[in-house]
Each structure stands twice: as structure tokens, then as C-alpha cells.
Amino acid sequence: MAKSVPAIFLDRDGTINVDHGYVHEIDNFEFIDGVIDAMRELKKMGFALVVVTNQSGIARGKFTEAQFETLTEWMDWSLADRDVDLDGIYYCPHHPQGSVEEFRQVCDCRKPHPGMLLSARDYLHIDMAASYMVGDKLEDMQAAVAANVGTKVLVRTGKPITPEAENAADWVLNSLADLPQAIKKQQKPAQ
């Protein structure tokens, strides 16, 4: 059996990139300051990097799945060009009130459900207890709880933080950029 690895599960909009609302074009995709360096450092620390993103804009007819895939490929290559190799990219195109019939459904992949995280766990042999979920919304924290992710990290770079989201999180950080240092500080043995 393959050895399990710890992972950093990453929401996309508001965590990796600025959330301009239904981001689906390269021209509107803006990496948040410091996140690329942080992702590179997290890889060096031995974490798998896994993007788990709700993309209801597909179901809502705001953009097509092909447009999302083109942007995702560009993001993946942009990160790879900066020595950040993602281990997985999982997305949910569904929404129960979607206008595109093919994607209008209740599913187990849309956060707060844990489907994307569990799929990644099974495929990549992830040690969930040693992993982190980083996101900007309550649904990210709820998905992490449902998937038994060890540490839930809420970031201030996306949607305004709600009291419910803050209560569900283990840590609240200003940005994903702060995560490597926070993990190192936590892992430091007591003197």
C-alpha cells in the first residue's frame, strides 16, 4: 500500500486568486500576493497541493466548462513555471438551481459536502489528519470537517469572514501566504 502524504487542500477564488466574481478568463485571474511563494514553500515542506473549488458559474450559465478548463490549464502552467506543481485539481460544476440542465443537481462534490476532498484522498493517498484545508468561507470549513481534515484554516483574502466560519476554523490567517510560517511555528518543539 502506498504511503499516505499530508496535503494542503486549497479553495481557489478568494484563497489562491482575487475573487472578482465568477472568474473564468485569464485577464481576470489575479494571484493573491505571496501565495505562489507560499505554495512553493509548502511543497518543500512535503505537502501535496490539491485545489478543491466550487464552480457554480458553470451550472448558472455564467461560463462554460471548456472556459473553466482553459483557465485551469493556464493557472496550472503558470504555477508550474514558478516551480509549483499541483498534485490535483478538483472542481464541482453543479448547483441545485443551475440554469444549465446538465449541471443542475444536488451532488456530494459541492462544498460543504466532502466529495472532492474524499476523491483526492483516495486517489492521492492523503493522510487527512495531517492535512490542512484553506478557504475563505464556511462551506470550506464544513467540507473539511466532513472529510476529517486535521486543521481548518480560514483566510481573510476572500469573502468577508462570518462568525460561523470563524467558529468552524481552527486558525484564521490574513492569507495563504502566511500558512507555511504558521505551520512551522506550530510544529516547533516546546523549549
Curated annotation (Swiss-Prot):
CDD domains: HAD_HisB-N. It is an enzyme of class 3 (hydrolase). Magnesium. Can also use other divalent metal cations as manganese and cobalt. Keywords: Carbohydrate metabolism, Cytoplasm, Hydrolase, Lipopolysaccharide biosynthesis, Magnesium, Metal-binding, Zinc. It comes from the Bacteria. GO terms for cellular component: cytosol. GO terms for biological process: ADP-L-glycero-beta-D-manno-heptose biosynthetic process; lipopolysaccharide core region biosynthetic process. Its EC number is 3.1.3.82. PANTHER family: D-GLYCERO-BETA-D-MANNO-HEPTOSE-1,7-BISPHOSPHATE 7-PHOSPHATASE (PTHR42891:SF1). Monomer. Belongs to the GmhB family. This is D-glycero-beta-D-manno-heptose-1,7-bisphosphate 7-phosphatase. It comes from Escherichia coli (strain K12).
